[in-house]
Amino acid sequence: MNRWFVLFAVVLAAGCQSMQSGTISRERIAEIVASPDRSAADRTNDQRRRPEPMLAFIGLRTGMVAMDVSAAGGYTTELIARAVGPTGKVYAQLPRNPQRVEARAKNPAVGHIVPVVRPFDDPVPPEISSNALDLVTLMFNYHDFGHLGVDRARFNRAVFAALKPGGMFVVADHSGRPGTGISESGTLHRIEEAFLRKEVEAAGFELAEEGNFLRNPNDPRDKETPDPPMPKDEFVLKFVKP
């Protein structure tokens, strides 16, 4: 066989594989955020949550199987569902009251959202086998595990077990002052970044990337809402299962 033909076939196959495994483009992310059927409440929330850099930071791919922990009203859940598309799936975990997420899932554009009512200590439903998930997200609620009495070590181990090797665990939260750990979770609703990182890494995760797009170095971090009013200092961490 002609060696140039073989070389061309190898390059073509590699290119196809790259396209299949590649993350969605910034143009596609902009289209997702601008989707006309997104709610007015979500669009208002965009101003604070900055969905475009967040989705780009996560590194989403079409067809991913993900779980959004503490999904609440489903703001992040819906964005991820739009990104992974109908060939993917997004489990929306909540400890109770899944009605708002169930309402979102009625939209055909995000009908692949699966509400899951599970405790934080044991968030992964039995239909998800070990090494099955591509992505787990937890947006601005890890700190709440402190005053809620959640067994955080058990939670982190459960997330680790559910992810595929190479799977990602993306955590965002409100930044606390050095030395405060999780002690201000029920008052200022903040957590020390280094403390969170240490707990997650203890489950076997490795820190892959830090996102700075929600940082505000002018926030003194001594109140729940900064005074004078300003954006909170918030961190975003991407962990990977080796």
For the regions a language model picked out, list residue spans one by one.
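A short acidic, Gly/Pro-enriched loop at the edge of an enzyme's catalytic core
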Residues: 125-136
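A short glycine-rich, Lys/Arg-flanked "PGG" loop and its adjoining helix->strand segment in the class I
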Residues: 81-82, 151-165
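Core SAM-dependent methyltransferase catalytic element
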Residues: 219-242
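Conserved beta-strand signature within the Rossmann-like core of class I S-adenosyl-L-methionine
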Residues: 166-175
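Class I SAM-dependent methyltransferase Rossmann-like catalytic core
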Residues: 28-57, 61
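Bacterial signal peptide processing site
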Residues: 17-19
